[in-house]
Swiss-Prot record:
Belongs to the UvrC family. This is UvrABC system protein C. GO terms for cellular component: cytoplasm; excinuclease repair complex. Its main location: cytoplasm. The gene is uvrC. It holds the Pfam family UvrC_RNaseH_dom.
Length: 609
């Protein structure tokens, strides 16, 4: 316990009412938020002699002071606790990092509506279907929709610029409303059917199409009847592949597995009785946290996150029973202003879905533990090979990417003992050097990375340089300069490519002694080095390609007299890209806002010349 904090004096002032407490460290940071029916009783438990919980011991040792907020009821305390956890993100609380907005399928409000992927604020008018658990689920659904319903998926600018059908029409994946290949009535009918399908009413869609097929056959419109028949067969095939519940309602089914410090909540999103999607969540759980706290924290943080656009069903089925379940139901219902039910003992279809969710959660934890153990073993082997006296907690790797000196980008990727730490990745756009000078590029990147480094900052234990002795010397010189007044500096290691750039033939060079050595091709430590090197290369080349494309788009158009940033943007947006601008006729260029007939001719001549 902190010597500054007088627990006995503090406890004499604490009420026995319900409420929330916030524990602070000496820096004034909130390190834990908790709630209690009886604050005095709960807080007293932290300061008993012989605490047997390691987490509690560590927490108490860092307490500098505690703030208390009284509430009218335990339900109010639950809600306030959740608000404080979201606000302060305390290190000793269970934290669910679920800050990405969820993707939707948008059916736009247009004369000829389009289906599109959407993430973010819902500003465009139309109907939004979702949310989907991830972007892959949306793209997969859109791909399926293209096969089932000939509705356009192009953006409005592309739609307006068409003078003839695109490839999607030839593939029977769009009915080409842009050039009048389908009547408005027929297109609207397909839009209605697509909307019903996205709502999960596929049997209603099939029944409608069967009636239309029979009507077309009676009227001897056999080609039309055949198209309806093919559409019905495709829909039935999709319906057969989906697991369907007799219960046609909406619910979330949550399977939970917690082992070796890793908690997984696997959610099945059941909509209209079908599995709409699934997703695994891995909240950050401090060691020896009580399972009830893990469950309570997840439910509150997941369903009461106002920053995430999420459709919340009335019913949630979860694999673990826990205390405060009814209080939790009441708290969420009050916060959402709607009925919210949590069930743990279920039968029939619900039980089947729950078993599936638990199986997925268990497998996910096993996979993570296997990966974690593999990475951990590789770190330990690397420590042994390098004869280090302290563990490696953070590694970084730098790489340079360019095309003949154009659009040079440096990457810095970060690994910890669990593998890639992508939130810490950085790219550096290299400026003001001789094109193709990799040494100067590396010097600029390393300088920018450590320019303002301080003790206690994010200092890597190992810094890999993807390159030979020359680049390593440049990096070592900068590190020596930047860390001269600090107690700790990274160990630099150059990773020189082997003969023919074949994996397993790399030469490793120590930055301080310039000693070179190689590892066996099947060495797990070498595999770790290859992993971080390859990840650095991937991250650098992706950044370089994006920068190069942006530069080429800009320079190609803005080199034309009269074309500035605004007109360049209008051309690219209206026609869909640089290649489309290059292939456009004068008549098509004139349709772009701000482009006169004379300017269109100038652009056409410049790009074709």
């Amino acid at each position: 316990m902190s010597s500054v904090f007088n627990a006995q004096s503090f406890l004499r002032t604490v009420s026995s009412s319900a409420g929330v407490y916030r524990m602070y460290d000496v820096k004034g940071d909130v390190i834990y938020v908790g709630k209690a029916k009886d604050l005095k009783k709960r807080l007293s438990s932290y300061f008993r002699k012989n605490l047997d919980n390691v987490k509690t011991q560590a927490l108490v040792s860092h307490i500098h002071h505690i703030d208390v907020t009284l509430t009218h009821s335990e339900t109010d305390a639950l809600l306030l606790e959740n608000d404080y956890i979201k606000q302060y993100m305390p290190k000793y609380n269970v934290l669910l990092r679920d800050d990405k907005s969820y993707p939707y399928i948008l059916l736009s409000q247009h004369e000829h509506p389009r289906l599109a992927y959407h993430r973010g604020p819902q500003r465009e008018k139309g109907h939004y279907f979702g949310p989907y658990p991830n972007g892959g689920a949306v793209r997969e659904s859109l791909h399926l929709m293209q096969k089932l319903f000939p509705i356009r998926q192009c953006d409005d600018l592309y739609y307006k610029s068409r003078s003839r059908p695109c490839l999607q029409y030839q593939l029977s994946r769009c009915s080409a409303p842009c050039v009048g290949k389908v009547s408005n009535a027929d297109y609207d009918e397909q839009v209605k059917l697509a909307s019903l399908f996205l709502k999960g009413k596929d049997q209603q869609v099939i029944s409608t199409l069967v009636a239309k097929m029979e009507q077309a056959a009676q009227q001897q419109e056999y080609e039309q009847a055949a198209r309806f028949r093919d559409q019905i067969m495709a829909l039935r095939k999709v319906a057969e592949q989906q697991e369907v519940s007799n219960n046609k309602g909406d619910m979330d089914v949550i399977g939970v597995h917690y082992a070796s410090g890793i908690a997984c909540f696997h959610l099945l999103f059941i909509r209209e009785g079908k599995i709409f999607g699934s997703r695994s969540y891995y909240p950050s759980v401090p060691a020896q946290t009580d399972m009830d706290e893990v469950l309570r924290s997840f439910i509150l943080q997941f369903y009461l996150n106002a920053d995430i656009q999420r459709t919340i069903p009335k019913e949630v089925v979860i694999s673990h029973n826990f205390e405060e379940l009814h209080e939790l139901e009441a708290a969420v219902s009050i916060a959402l202003n709607k009925k919210f039910s949590i069930k743990t003992n279920v039968r029939a279809d619900r039980a089947s879905f729950l078993r599936l969710a638990v199986t997925n959660a268990t497998n996910a934890v096993i996979t993570r533990l296997s990966h974690k153990n593999t990475v951990e073993q590789r770190f330990v082997l690397l420590e042994e090979i390098l004869e280090l006296s302290t563990p490696i907690y953070r590694m970084e790797c730098f790489d340079i990417s360019h095309t003949m000196g154009e659009s040079t980008v440096a990457s810095c990727v970060v690994f910890n003992r669990e593998g890639p730490h992508k939130g810490e990745y950085r790219r550096y756009n290299i400026e003001g050097i001789t094109p193709g000078d990799d040494y100067a590029a590396m010097k600029q990147a390393i300088t920018r990375r450590f320019d303002k480094i301080e003790a206690g900052g994010k200092i890597p234990d190992i810094l890999f340089i993807d390159g030979g002795l020359g680049q390593l010397r440049i990096a070592q010189k900068i590190v020596d300069e930047k860390f001269v007044h600090l107690d700790k500096a990274p160990q630099l290691i150059g990773v020189a490519k082997g003969e023919g750039r074949k994996p397993g033939l790399e030469t490793l060079i120590l930055g301080d002694t310039e000693t070179s050595f190689s590892l066996e091709g099947d060495s797990p430590a070498l595999h770790l080095i290859q992993h971080i090197r390859d990840e650095s290369h991937r991250f650098a080349i992706t950044g370089h390609r994006n920068r190069r494309q942006k530069t080429r788009n800009t320079s190609t158009l803005e080199s034309i007299p009269g074309i500035g940033p605004k007109r360049r943007k209008a051309l690219l947006q209206h026609l869909g890209g640089l290649q489309e601008v290059k292939g456009a006729s004068v008549a098509e260029l004139v349709k772009v806002p701000g482009i006169s007939i004379e300017m269109a001719q100038t652009i056409h001549d410049a790009l074709r010349g």
